[in-house]
Amino acid sequence: LVLDPHDEYYGRTGLGLKDHVERGAVVYYTPVNPPAGARSLKINLSCIKPDHFQGAIQLSDPQRQCLFAYYRKYKKEWIRSILEDKKIEGVAFHEDTIAVVKRRLIGLLGLDVENGVVVGTQGIFDVVAGENTITEICSELERGKTVIVDTSYFAGAIEIMIGTIIVSEMFDKYRYYKRVGKLEDKPVISIVLEEA
């Protein structure tokens, strides 16, 4: 897994892994104008879990508790539920906590919200597209492919979050494989995280 903050590994504008003899083992995800054979980088909001924010943004204990409470109650719809002011029976958060959480989610995820409803997105996070992106990336890594994710358009927090989403999904899969005795059959996955 290569998280590429300079968009240089694939070789969109020059030589790169796309020109390697084993280019069939290279998969490239980019958020803007994917070249032929590349894939568009979109991640559906329903794929995001509260843990994915760790390291990307600082949250107070009440804010973190808010994220986890909404995730436990609303599962894949937890982000929308916060934005739509849905309540959790028997649980109350200070209105300032909810307001800060909303602002942080809207800002970090690039959401356009009107009256609590997501009406559009400005980045890679989406309400319609991207439901299978993380699953596909993980499957390609499991098959031994080199997956390059172009993070050159993002601030550090988003790059960290993208990496966290992918790696946590892979870790969960590999933990399952270990439990059922299939880990030995899986490839070791290396992660290249280059600083910009």
Regions found by a protein language model. Name each.
Residues V2-A196:
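P-loop NTPase motor domains
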